[in-house]
């Protein structure tokens, strides 16, 4: 079986991806800032008959991601798949946006993707096999009111994805992005009913997406 890392795997889209990859036969590294919340994901992976490694990882910290890769190689001997899913929002109109909220979103969403990707590229290129999937966002292409930081981070992830794909294709390491629209997760549950209704009117199916929709796209 393949060894797959899923960051931000404790809930929402990350959990759905971890479960789907386990069902497809991969052993899963459940990487999240909160390993207590990750226990449900671990249980689901094990229920699918695969191994799970529950690691506390702050993707914004390069030392953490490097230690994560070293731990996986020590325990399981290889890394085949990386899904860069960890992400946060700190919404606000630009004039009201605090610099710390701008920086934090970029650190997690963009720098986190950079750190994790860099940590796994060496073992992937060495074994001449790797699959990296970055979870971007449709907001990175369209923009969205109150999300200058988030939109900038996700637009950057798309550019990063295209570049790293070109750099490592010759080593049989593919790098792709999946850009979800509005998905029914804890991140969107904070939206008011009016905002949700307005969003649904823009969607042909007239509903928010589900984490399973995205997990199937990743698979």
Model regions and ranges:
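Active-site helix of classical SDR
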Residues: 117, 153, 161
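C-terminal helical subdomain
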Residues: 177, 200-219
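Substrate-binding pocket helix/loop in short-chain dehydrogenase/reductase
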Residues: 93-94, 98-106, 199
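The beta1-alpha1 cofactor-binding region of Rossmann-like NAD(H)/NADP(H)-dependent oxidoreductases
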Residues: 35-36, 56-67, 99, 212-213
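Alpha-helical segment proximal to the catalytic Tyr-Lys
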Residues: 122, 166-170
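Canonical Rossmann dinucleotide-binding motif of NAD(H)/NADP(H)-dependent dehydrogenases/reductases
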Residues: 2-29
């Amino acid at each position: 079986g393949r060894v797959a890392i899923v960051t931000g795997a404790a809930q929402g889209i990350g959990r759905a991806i971890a479960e789907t990859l386990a069902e497809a036969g991969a052993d899963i590294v459940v990487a999240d800032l909160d390993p207590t919340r990750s226990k449900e994901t671990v249980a689901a992976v094990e229920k699918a008959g695969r191994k799970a490694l529950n690691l506390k990882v702050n993707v914004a910290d390069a030392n953490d991601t490097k230690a994560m890769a070293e731990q996986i190689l020590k325990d399981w001997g290889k890394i085949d798949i990386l899904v860069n899913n960890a992400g946060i929002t700190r919404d606000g109109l630009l004039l009201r946006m605090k610099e710390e909220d701008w920086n934090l979103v970029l650190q997690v969403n963009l720098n986190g993707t950079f750190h994790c990707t860099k940590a796994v590229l060496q073992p992937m290129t060495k074994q001449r096999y790797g699959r990296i999937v970055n979870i971007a966002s449709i907001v990175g292409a369209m923009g969205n009111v109150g999300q200058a930081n988030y939109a900038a981070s996700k637009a950057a992830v798309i550019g990063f994805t295209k570049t790293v794909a070109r750099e490592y294709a010759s080593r049989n390491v593919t790098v792709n992005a999946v850009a979800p629209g509005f998905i029914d997760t804890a991140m969107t549950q904070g939206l008011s009913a009016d905002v949700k209704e307005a969003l649904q009117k823009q969607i042909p199916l007239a509903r928010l997406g589900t984490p399973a929709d995205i997990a199937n796209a990743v698979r």
